[in-house]
Regions:
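A charged helix-plus-loop insertion that forms the helical arch/lid used to bind
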Residues: 53-77
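Surface-exposed, charge/polar-rich loops and edge strands
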Residues: 90, 94, 123-124, 132-134, ...
């Protein structure tokens, strides 16, 4: 059965760096069973409705500004899979899923991690968008539907950050984590294996935590985690390949199921 990886994306410069986090992603790529294909849920494709990339050769999207030229010169030419995209349309029904053949591609939430895990870019991939109009529990249920892919050897990668507050980022000097960021990061880890009604899940109700709103002033970087937790069968081990908080308020926590 294929693995699920949650909240593995962090910040753009990791693409060019060799550090604790990038080495952990490289290790995952070398040690996990090689998937037949990969479905990525990225914080950077936050849409009204649900879409899936359905082109043969998705472009590499550089959806950021103000970084070194080397980052813009980096491309990740992994093949797309229109067949897998259509499979997702059928699997997620009755949720309507739009086949995107030109508007998007692989944004840095997906290729920024996968270029470290699978640098040869030779595994077929599709990217699934996050519907901005739906509540947290809905995204968890989407993960439950995606769980079937894992039995087909398809890896689910959810890319985001459980703490992502750019307004409080420490760009210079002291980069120690804020107490509220550490508290929320620990809260997430403590509740990864919680089982019960989805509507009562502490990580679905993350805004109930005193640091939830400050850690996630907008939801798009948090929600990918719920897709992976939804795909968990309740019995597999859940492990943390790497953890940490950078620049005060960017969580580097990665979660692996299976």
């Amino acid at each position: 059965r294929s693995r699920g990886l949650g909240d593995v994306y962090k910040r753009q410069m990791n693409v060019l760096e060799d550090n604790l986090y990038t080495r952990s992603w490289q290790k995952l790529g070398m040690t996990l069973p090689r998937p037949q294909a990969i479905v990525v849920v990225s914080a950077h494709w936050f849409t009204r409705g649900t879409g899936v990339t359905a082109m043969e050769t998705p472009p590499t999207i550089h959806d950021f500004g103000g970084f070194p030229q080397a980052l813009y010169d980096t491309h990740y030419p992994a093949p797309g899979s229109p067949v897998l995209a259509q499979h997702l349309v059928e699997l997620l029904a009755p949720v309507p899923v739009t086949l995107d053949k030109e508007a998007w591609g692989f944004d840095h939430g997906s290729w920024g991690v996968l270029i470290k895990m699978y640098p040869d870019a030779d595994i077929p991939m599709v990217q699934l968008s996050i519907d901005s109009s739906k509540p947290a529990a809905w995204h968890f249920e989407m993960g439950r539907k995606l769980a079937a892919l894992r039995d087909e050897g398809i890896m689910l990668v959810a890319s985001g950050n459980v703490v992502h507050n750019l307004r409080t980022v420490k760009w210079h000097g002291d980069s120690s984590p804020y107490p509220w960021a550490m508290s929320f990061n620990e809260y997430v880890k403590a509740n990864l294996t919680w089982q019960g009604a989805v509507e009562q899940h502490p990580l679905v109700n993350y805004l109930d935590h005193e640091g939830g709103a400050l850690s996630n002033p907008t939801p798009e970087h948090y929600l990918p985690l719920l897709y992976v937790l939804g795909a968990w069968d309740g019995q597999e081990p859940i492990t943390i390949p790497v953890d940490g908080i950078e620049m005060g308020s960017l969580s580097m926590l990665s979660v692996q199921i299976g």
